[in-house]
């Protein structure tokens, strides 16, 4: 049916326009909706003649963010150490106790970093697409990280082809501390991957004839 074909083409055209508009706005540093990350609130601003919102640092929450990163930057500090600390202090994040998946997500988020040339070089070395010039990374602003058009969902933790854009808001965490945390996260992921690689598909299925215990790796 020709009507169905035209309807499908129209849907695809609209979808492409929406996608193009999204990437165009994201490349210019617009906040792309959603709740403000912990440590910030939003205020309305106008960028390039378009009404949008800007993240503004919340001083009390920013202090918790800095402490979180300072703690994790220590070689022996774990997720559990940090979540327990904030739970014992009665500090909530968006009204909830801090849990490990949320903590990991926050530690990876470049929205908090005071992005300088070291941050630029790090993301460049990881294969990210950097929208701004190196000279723009002055150690003042945070960043937005957007999933590139060709990035597969399974590779979302990989920075290759993801798009990094300087944001108009001020960063919270010094670049050296943020980078220490990010590299620690990357090393932990490598260790976990190596452990998974040592396990065979026969684990738990074959048992020792003498002791009866199952094969674990």
Whereabouts are the PLM-identified features?
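Glycine-rich, charge-decorated loop segments at or immediately adjacent to ligand/cofactor-binding or catalytic sites
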Residues: 1
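Conserved catalytic breakage-reunion loop centered on the nucleophilic residue
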Residues: 4-217
